[in-house]
Amino acid sequence: MEKSLFDTKNLKITPMMKQYLDIKDKYKDSILLFRLGDFYEAFFDDALTVSKILNIVLTKRQDAPMAGIPYHALDNYLKKLVDAGYKVAICEQMEDPALAKGIVKREVTRVITPGTIIEDELLTTENNYMMSLYETKDGKISCILTDSSTGEVIIKQMESIDEISDFLQTHRVSQIICPENFYDKIVNIARVLGIFVDKLDDWYYENDIQTIKEAYGLVSIEHFELGEASKPLCATIKYINYTLNRQAKLKVPKTLDESKYMTLDSTTVENLSLIPGDKGKNLYDVLNKTNTPMGGRLLKWVILHPLKDRNEIEKRLWYVEAFYEDPLLTNEIREYLNGVYDLERIINRLEYDSAKPKDLISLKTTLEVVEPIKEALSTNEKLIQLAQMLPDLSQIKVKIENTLLEEFEGELGEGKIIKEGVSKELDEYRELLYHSNEKLKEFEERERAKTGIQKLKVSFNNVFGYYIEIPKGQVKFAPQEYTRIQTLVNAERYTTTELKEFEQKILAAKEKVEILEKTIFKQICDELKGYTQDLRKLAEMLSWIDVYSNFAYVSKLYSYSKPEISDSEFKVLNGRHPVVERFVDEFVPNDIYMSDELRMYILTGPNMSGKSTYIRQVGLIALMTQIGCFVPAQYAKVPVFDRIFTRMGARDDISTGKSTFLTEMNEVALILSKATQKSLVLLDEVGRGTSTFDGISIAWAMSEYIYNEIKCKTIFATHFTELTELSEGYSGIKNLTVDVKETPDGVVFLHKVVEGVADRSYGIEVAAIAGLPESIIERAKEILNIIVEKSDLEKKVGVLKEGQMKKIKATKKSVPEGQMKLF
């Protein structure tokens, strides 16, 4: 943190201020919210920051700038501070100020950071990841991705900073922790992406296996097979221990294995509009009809991590088909899932001793639908296995049911949450506490009868507690055992031994009710912790049931069909773009056929004709197959791709200062270096960022290299009609175009992809449709005619004649290494 603007040396230091400064010294990098009565106060620089961000009044206390937050509104203000990129240390009063001898004891009980939030009020339903990074001796980067709110832990090995940057753009990472020597390498990328970075001392990354064992409660962790990941995992656990002020509780780590999951780079995620982002409509929003927060999070994970294992893909499709073929069952299951709460986060709050009574009621409500779900699934032969994988936790439901009231008001400790009959002692104190008015009324009536003073009344205030009040004119009738405690203009106030004893009982009852109710609640929470593993298994299974039934529901709703998995053939009849079709009145379907032999298409056609939609549609159908969903097509046979690469559109990379063309070439270079024969490559307008001659040359050479060397399935949409000549030299390259109909009123784009080559670009017609002034359109037509008349395009561009093609065919052997440097 920056040096303080305030010098506290000349400040008159009270015991309370000394306590504040001592605690602040331990949390210099955090905003310290210091509990004073009903407020959390910030002082000095923190006060200025809090006042500015929260737009609250800045005041003073003994010349120290001060800004206060009401304790009951803390969560609302906390979110704003954390969203602004600050760590916040919460300092609580650890004893009742009324009972404290001297200065009230205070301690920091929690440090809130963007990546360690577990409080439901501060979270959305999406994952909230923290990334821990550690650079290994061989220059690779070991990464641990953790969601503290769910306990999820993911291990991933990265090759470079660029790979980290790519990953950060596709996953919801709100915080990065790293050693000091790695901070400068990541901080600029993080700032561009709005991610908070905390650099840690080296001891966090010491390979302390005991730290990991304690977090998991295990004697051995050899089966985790952590390798270098143990260091960033250690740092993660220690950091969570520090921020939550308690032992980290995490799930067994999952390795993001590239042999199992397809890697999707951020360019492809953006180009295919897979998840919500700046471009609006996306695949996740179209497919997401899930009924639980857990299912929604899992769906996003599934979309971003398509499977590469054919058996696993077919297993998912098997379950989806079972739901698809039984729509009544699907609707029944989805109805039950509506009653499922965010079980993952409830479990974690239990583990961290931060669960509230409403969490247990939500848990009970969730458990109430498990048996009906199990029974419903068991009626379908294909889904019996899912039913059998749901653990029986009815004993938890009964325990909560027998302990907590279904509906309650107030806070824990007020005696309004635990059922009657759970604790005889609690019941007795609650009776006294909540029926004291009746007792007082009886006492008042008895005293009136005894003294004959009909206007005698019993009341309470914070100064004297309970007292008897008698009007001045009747004071002479006050019994001798009444002790005067206050004289007013029109009355005298008294107390008695009996009234004092009654007051003490009520005060004791209030304290006892609070202690007993909190103790009983903690006991049941501690008991539930013993079921953590089963509860996590239940949460996982309910999430998958939600995703499977969701895929079936969406597939039925949108008329998707089950794809067939093939060895190599890629055949789609009447395929549609799953996102675009949802937002147009009528969508024109198209086919695709590719194989090992026919593996490249050159797609030409005018702007607005639908070229980009078509190639994206092909990519999305492939991806949807590999996430285990039905696809928008009449029929689909799809191979398992190891990667889907895209290069589309023109854009600068503002974060690195790269031009449109350099950005384009970097993306192409990635494709050429990473693609294999099992990849799907989708290219749109490569080479448009430079001169026409250079662009055609690069696009031609690149197409040859992909066809001859990589041999993967490729669709190349381009305005360079010269590239269609490639089909004359290579039997596995075909030309496609998007059909256009010319009418007296103008051009009509039919959006139908057919074999052939575009004979015109129709750029002027598109400009007219876009609304350019008629004078400009007419002038453009005149200029076009002049250019056409005076140009010999074949000579200028050097389109290859039949004889020249023989020379080109010779390049099929290989592409010189030097040529690759162009990319």
From Swiss-Prot:
Binding-site residues for ATP, renumbered to this chain: 605-612
Gene3D superfamilies for this protein: 1.10.1420.10, DNA repair protein MutS, domain I, MutS, connector domain, P-loop containing nucleotide triphosphate hydrolases
The keyword Nucleotide-binding appears for this protein: yes
Record-linked Pfam families: MutS_I, MutS_II, MutS_III, MutS_IV, MutS_V
GO molecular function, one term: ATP-dependent DNA damage sensor activity
Gene Ontology biological-process annotations: mismatch repair
Disulfide bond sites: none
Coiled coil: none
Listed GO CC annotations: cytosol
Keyword field: ATP-binding, DNA damage, DNA repair, DNA-binding, Nucleotide-binding
Role of this protein: This protein is involved in the repair of mismatches in DNA. It is possible that it carries out the mismatch recognition step. This protein has a weak ATPase activity.
Family: Belongs to the DNA mismatch repair MutS family.
PANTHER family linked to this entry: DNA MISMATCH REPAIR PROTEIN MSH1, MITOCHONDRIAL, DNA MISMATCH REPAIR PROTEIN MUTS FAMILY MEMBER
Protein name: DNA mismatch repair protein MutS
Organism: Fervidobacterium nodosum (strain ATCC 35602 / DSM 5306 / Rt17-B1)
